[in-house]
Structures are given as C-alpha cells and as structure tokens.
C-alpha cells in the first residue's frame, strides 16, 4: 500500500472499514481525523463529525467513538503476515501518511485525482468503490458477482460475525438494529469466511 495507486489505497481502506464496522456509507464518510488516536498497532479510535445526523436517530446510533481493532497486529508466521495485509489499523496508518500532503478536509476519506484531489469524499462515490471492491473479491474467486450495492458490505460483515459465533447482541448494537427481523429479512447471507478472506488477501 505504501507505493500502490492512491485509488486502490483509498478503496481498500474504505472496504476494510465497511467490513469491520458494519457502518453505512454515510456513516463512514462522516468520520474525521479530528481526535483520531492510535493505541500502538492494536487499535485506532475515530469520531464522526459532530454535525452528522445518522439515518437511525437514536441514543444508540449517536454512539461515539468508533474503535477499530487490528487484525494479526504482531504477525510471526508467513500466514499471519499475509493476513496482516488486511489489518485496518495498518491500512489507516498508511492512508493517513499518504494523504498528509494536499489534504483539504478534516474528513477521513478523501477524493483522489480529478479537479479537487484531497477534498471530502461523498457517500455516493464511496458506494461505487465498495461495489467495485466486492465485485473484485468474487471475480478473484472465479465466481460470478451477484447483484450488488454498497449496502452489501453491511450484510457481509454482520453475516460473517454471526456465523463466526459473535454474540448477537454485540452484532445488533454495532449495526444499530432494534430487533432480529431487520437482519434476517434484509442483511443475512451465508458467507464462506475463509474464501472471502483469501480472495481479498490475494489482491492486497
């Protein structure tokens, strides 16, 4: 990522954030670098723009901060080092270093290229990037991509968590759902965790 195309770097960070937080696109583009804090290589804490109004307005949906934990933060084996390429904390450090020059906004995710590089990224543009990322994961596995939209990352992330045995209440709170029906009706899908992870790692 240190020398990769900036479009790839931005899209990769956005995809990792979407998959590890289960946030909506609008919530991801509301994250800022103000108050952003790293706790070594183990986690990063971010805050949304105070003016941001989430889709689900409730005490739960206004939670802050957003805490993102590292993936294999201290890799020892070749396999651990390979999986560490998917670490969102690592990706965040590289992204912030590469956007430190030319940054025009306090928003975390920025545009690149075009007429105004370094400006705040819109949720619409982010949606396109997320769909491209999911499509790439499917095609890398040699499978046809289903009908996709940016919201698919939200369903994928929460489905992986449920299938991996994460406590349902923790999943529900992360996604800001009031009950089980929302997840089962709109988001649940069977996910082969190892296949998806391996497909993305090959592109890292």
Predicted regions and their residues:
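Extended, non-catalytic subsegments within catalytic or DNA/protein-binding/adaptor domains
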Residues: 1-204
């Amino acid at each position: 990522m240190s020398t990769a195309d900036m479009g790839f770097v931005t899209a990769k960070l956005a995809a990792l954030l979407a998959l590890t937080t289960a946030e909506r696109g609008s919530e991801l583009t509301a994250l800022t670098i103000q108050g952003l804090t790293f706790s070594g290589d183990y986690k990063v804490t971010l805050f949304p723009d105070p003016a941001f109004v989430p889709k689900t307005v409730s005490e739960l949906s206004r939670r802050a901060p957003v805490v993102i934990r590292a993936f294999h933060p201290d890799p020892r084996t070749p396999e651990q080092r390979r999986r560490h390429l998917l670490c969102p904390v690592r990706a965040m450090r590289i992204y912030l270093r590469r956007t430190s020059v030319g940054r025009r906004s306090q928003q975390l995710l920025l545009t690149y290229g075009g007429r105004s590089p370094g400006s705040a990224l819109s949720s619409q543009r982010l949606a396109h990037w997320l769909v491209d990322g999911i499509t790439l994961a499917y095609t890398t596995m040699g499978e046809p991509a289903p009908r996709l939209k940016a919201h698919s990352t939200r369903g994928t992330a929460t489905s992986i968590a449920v299938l991996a045995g994460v406590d349902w209440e923790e999943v529900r709170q992360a996604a800001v759902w009031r009950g089980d029906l929302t997840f089962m009706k709109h988001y649940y899908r069977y996910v082969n965790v190892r296949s998806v992870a391996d497909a993305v790692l090959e592109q890292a």
